[in-house]
Amino acid sequence: EISCSLVGSEMCIRDRQWAYREKFEKAGITALLGSGFDPGVTGVFSAYALKHYFDEINYIDILDCNGGDHGYPFATNFNPEINIREVSAKGSYWEDGHWVETEPMEIKREYDFPEVGMKDMYLLHHEEIESLALNIPGIKRIRFFMTFGQSYLTHLKCLENVGMTSIKPIMYEGKEIVPLQFLKAVLPDPASLGPRTKGKTNIGCIFTGKKDGKEKTIYIYNVCDHEECYKEVGSQAVAYTTGVPAMIGAMMLMTKTWDKDGVYNIE
């Protein structure tokens, strides 16, 4: 079991990584944690907002919207096993120095995303909350929301009801299988979605805090077009927004633009 002693959550996954900080410092090497979009660019947005727009940030809502349509009744835009486990797990958010746990998909909000439109979004636990709670001074609450369409949720509920999202091994014809891994094998490969996906993604952070004694709120976000991403690199925008920041992070390490011995989150 992984606990997060630094911020008081049993849900955190960063402790085992942060524990290597001293070893990496002594070895003179750098580890960069979470260099995708979320986590990754969302951490950059947070550091940028604090540096340029706020004296202190009190609230962060991280929003991940995929407004794309791949034409399948049900498919996931990245590893189905990870995606389905993430959605079916209990949610959590950080508020006033401690973690608040929620039931899966319990908290729902609507948001009008620029260039995408109005979407339903649901609160999930996400790992960047763990580091931002430590690294953004003055923070009072951090939440993460991801959009899901009703068709996706209906299919997922049906699969859950018949046991197909279970990670508990079962015996089938003399062999042990994990239902969720079997489901992954029969679903469309996320890598195959690129040429058939249309629409846009919108991923960003709503920041509320103070500047010169006055409260202000801003939304810093990125929009990617699935079809344009496919033209450029041969993948849909979900893979694009994950892979391009990872490449940039690696490039900045290799060129010594980022050169600090130890283990660090991107913000």
What are these regions (language model features)?
Residues 1-8, 13:
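Single conserved hydrophobic/aromatic residue that forms the stacking wall/gate
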Residues 9-10, 31-34, 61:
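Short catalytic-loop micro-motif centered on adjacent basic/acidic residues
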Residues 10, 14-30:
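Rossmann-fold NAD(P)-binding glycine/threonine-rich loop
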Residues 19-25, 47-49, 158-159:
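Short low-complexity, flexible loop/linker segments enriched in glycine and/or proline
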Residues 27-31, 257-260:
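Short, surface-exposed connector motifs at secondary-structure boundaries
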Residues 33-41:
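Active-site capping/gating segments
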Residues 42-54:
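Active-site-proximal alpha-helical scaffold in enzymes
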Residues 52-267:
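C-terminal catalytic/substrate-binding lobe primarily of soluble NAD(P)-dependent oxidoreductases
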